[in-house]
Every structure is written in C-alpha cells, then in structure tokens.
C-alpha cells in the first residue's frame, strides 16, 4: 500500500506546478487549475489543501483574492535550484 505524502511533500508538489509554468516570485496561478494539475499528478484534494496550508505557513505561497495562489520570494527560492538542474 502506498504511503500518503507529507504536507511538505504536497507543498513541494504545488511549487513544482509553479516551476512547470516558469513562474517567478510574485507570479500568480489560479487555485482551480493548480489543484487540477496536482490531482492529475496523482494527488488528492485533501493532499492539495494540506500542501497549500504548509506552503502558506512556511511563507512559500500566499492566498490571494479571486481564488489565486501567489508565489513568494521564499517559495521561488525553494524551487529555483530545481529549475536550473539538468
């Protein structure tokens, strides 16, 4: 039986969605499409919410108006090494 991802792993999966969109600090994604991409990759709604909460608590993401998720400088710093790896 597969183990469930930790909230940190889910948060990093959400950051990976920003990375796939070539996002930078202060870029915004709509929560709905981000959630859809997360679930398409095998995650659940509960895992997405747990990851989002973890990322917000750690200053990686901010929840904005109109169902948006904003990548912070701290969040960008977390994904930046992954964006430059081969």
Regions found by a protein language model. Give the residues of each.
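A short, conserved structural fragment
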Residues: 56-66
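Short, amphipathic alpha-helical interaction segments positioned at domain boundaries
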Residues: 76-86
């Amino acid at each position: 039986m597969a183990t469930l991802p930790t909230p940190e792993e889910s948060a990093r999966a959400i950051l990976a969605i920003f990375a796939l969109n070539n996002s930078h600090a202060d870029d915004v994604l709509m929560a709905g499409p981000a959630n859809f991409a997360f679930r398409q990759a095998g995650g659940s709604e509960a895992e997405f919410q747990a990851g989002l909460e973890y990322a917000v608590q750690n200053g990686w993401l901010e929840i904005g108006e109109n169902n948006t998720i904003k990548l912070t400088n701290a969040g960008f710093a977390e994904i930046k090494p992954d964006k430059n790896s081969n």
